[in-house]
Amino acid sequence: MDELNCGQGEQNAGPEKKKSTSKIVKRTLVVAALALAVYVVYSVVYLFVSPDRNIQQIYLVPEDAAFIIQSSAPIEDWEKFSGSETWQCLKKAKSFEEVTKSVEKLDSVVKSNKVLLSLVGERDMLISLHKTRATKWDFLLILDMQKTSKMDLLKDQVETVLVMSGFTVTNRMHNGINILEMRDSETRDIFYIAFVDNHLVGSYTSGLVESAIDSRNKPKIGLDQSFIETEKLVSGKGLVRVFINYARVPQFMSIYLGARNEYIDLFSNSMNFAGLYLNTDKERMEVKGYTLRKDSADPYVTALLNSGKHKMKAHEILSGRTALYTNIGFN
């Protein structure tokens, strides 16, 4: 009888144990769901209600930038340029062979990564060009991530996505900012990226990313009065805006010339900044802009800038081997 009663007790305990386990699982799921809901609500509130810590893109550009390219809708602007009839005609010319190779390489990158690059959308983007070695230059990419930059979860997942894409990813800190190092297993190239306030900064040269981080609190170009005036003159115009920092042009051009050039130095010592904007349509491609000269500009340069606009036809009879031709007119 005792054995029979024990057997019945064990059978009765089975269903009760299952019910208890089921309750624990349900409670755990409810708590997890509530925690997730609270986190989502917090993230949304933080994203849209908390104050933004935004800084201007130009503040992150290191002072040794020779050229700065600016766009408000980079992907759309690129498609307009690469697909324009004017460019399709120009790229057939022999003199544009090297330029064409670079443009087509960039175009293939844009097309093959269209889904990824579509995330860029209408975001402000800056690309600055810098001399990095005696015969080398590199670019620094600065992309405004807007409110997305406040989502720490997204930043944390970037490394996971990169690893899944085949990159070897390492981390290191510089001046309080985490730098992700993406190594391509095939080419062994390393691309460095960092989130600096509301911007994503990237380059194949680690020193440029570090300089951008350092420039965050000690901007140079962005506070230069000549640059500020130049930027106002071309703001919002054309497909892209290009700024020339004449103070850095001589060292940048020495990459191709092998040494400094007296004519380049002449213009460099006479100019501050130039702001240009590019437009293109079915009939033409044009670049217009403004140059701010120094008060101490060389008289020759001043004469060139103040020359008249009378029509000249000398170019119609010049040899095709002519290296440089300048129109100069005087009142």
Residue spans of the language-model regions?
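Short, exposed beta-strand/loop patches in secreted or surface proteins that constitute
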Residues: 169-173, 191-194, 276-278
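Extended, charge-rich low-complexity interaction segments
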Residues: 103-104, 195-211, 258-278
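Charged, amphipathic alpha-helical scaffolding segments
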Residues: 192-213, 281-292, 296-304, 315-316, ...
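N-terminal Lys/Arg-rich, disordered targeting/topogenic segments
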Residues: 1-24
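Structural boundary/hinge residues at secondary-structure and domain interfaces
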Residues: 22-181, 228-269, 290-331
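Extended alpha-helical scaffold/tether regions of large eukaryotic proteins
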Residues: 183, 268-270, 278-287
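A conserved glycine-rich beta-strand in the N-terminal activation segment of trypsin-fold
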Residues: 184-185, 189-254
